[in-house]
């Protein structure tokens, strides 16, 4: 990996005599291979893909920057994101966070921090984001919409329907039900929803606890939307403790009828998993559709 050491020397703010002395592969990052780069004084987390042009990592860095600006939950500092100098592929270089076990206080801090993040409103009060980004490696359209119902239909459900069709994972009856749901969202999604800043891909693998017990958010797919959509995803695959939810509820209680919409919002993430991982997620998608449209 001498080429990576040379690339890192070009993009990192190294001191004149500072040399990268170690580059070790580590676990972390679902969209690329991950490494820790070390000098005698410092460490960085490096994630790269030889088959990407760097845009995925640029969008990740922009999402981290938005979360950092909000100041609600810590994020790693970004040192570089983009193409690899003089080589095909892309990479992102982040501050190395020494991880440790999550403490009770860590999960409570994450819950309070997410509540604070969700109080951050979009510029102009609209839903979406000023550019498209990615959820995993799937393109995620954004742009701006005046209502959450419009955004959820036009920028979330319908794009995934089209991607699923291309992958052969949208049989006729599933498509029919999904279109009926899109056409009747006003039955379940009320007016007056405020556009909260969302991490966008908050499963238990996209946050970590530092060795000091501080929660950090990683791998975002940010947009401004209904905070219930974010919280619904945290419940889809589990991994968040009751302390996390109690701290969130104390700081920013969810509406009493949130549970009516929870499966509706989990549907987007089930469609993402259907596209990425196959028909094993098809029955879960179908159960949600039957629940809402029969």
Where are the regions a protein language model picked out?
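An alpha-helical support segment within catalytic cores of ATP-dependent transferases
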Residues: 2-15, 85, 122-197, 210, ...
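Activation segment
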Residues: 51, 84, 99, 158, ...
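Hydrophobic packing residues in well-ordered alpha-helices of helical domains and bundles
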Residues: 57, 107-110, 174-178, 285
């Amino acid at each position: 990996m001498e080429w990576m050491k040379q690339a890192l020397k070009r993009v990192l703010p190294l001191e004149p005599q500072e040399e990268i002395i170690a580059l070790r592969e580590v676990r972390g990052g679902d969209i690329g291979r991950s490494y820790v780069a070390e000098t005698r004084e410092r460490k960085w987390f490096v994630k790269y893909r030889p088959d990407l042009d760097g845009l995925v990592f640029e969008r990740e860095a922009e999402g981290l920057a938005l979360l950092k600006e909000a100041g609600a939950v810590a994020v790693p500092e970004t040192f570089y994101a983009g193409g690899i100098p003089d080589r095909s592929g892309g990479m992102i270089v982040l501050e190395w966070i020494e991880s440790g076990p999550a403490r009770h206080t860590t999960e409570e801090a994450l819950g309070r921090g997410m509540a604070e993040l969700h109080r951050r409103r979009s510029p102009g009060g609209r839903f979406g984001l000023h550019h498209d980004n990615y959820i995993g490696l799937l393109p995620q359209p954004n742009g701006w919409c005046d209502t959450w119902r419009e955004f959820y239909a036009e920028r979330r459900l319908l794009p995934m329907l089209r991607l699923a069709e291309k992958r052969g994972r949208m049989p006729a009856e599933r498509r029919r039900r999904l279109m009926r749901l899109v056409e009747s969202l006003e039955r379940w999604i009320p007016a007056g929803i405020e556009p909260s800043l969302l991490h966008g891909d908050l499963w238990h693998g996209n946050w970590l606890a530092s060795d000091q017990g501080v929660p950090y958010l990683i791998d975002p797919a940010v947009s401004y939307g209904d905070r219930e959509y974010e919280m619904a995803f945290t419940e889809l695959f589990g991994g968040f403790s009751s302390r996390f939810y109690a701290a969130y509820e104390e700081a920013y209680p969810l509406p009493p009828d949130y549970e009516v919409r929870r499966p509706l919002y989990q549907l987007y993430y089930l469609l993402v998993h259907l596209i990425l991982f196959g028909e094993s997620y098809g029955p879960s998608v179908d159960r949600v559709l039957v629940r809402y449209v029969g």
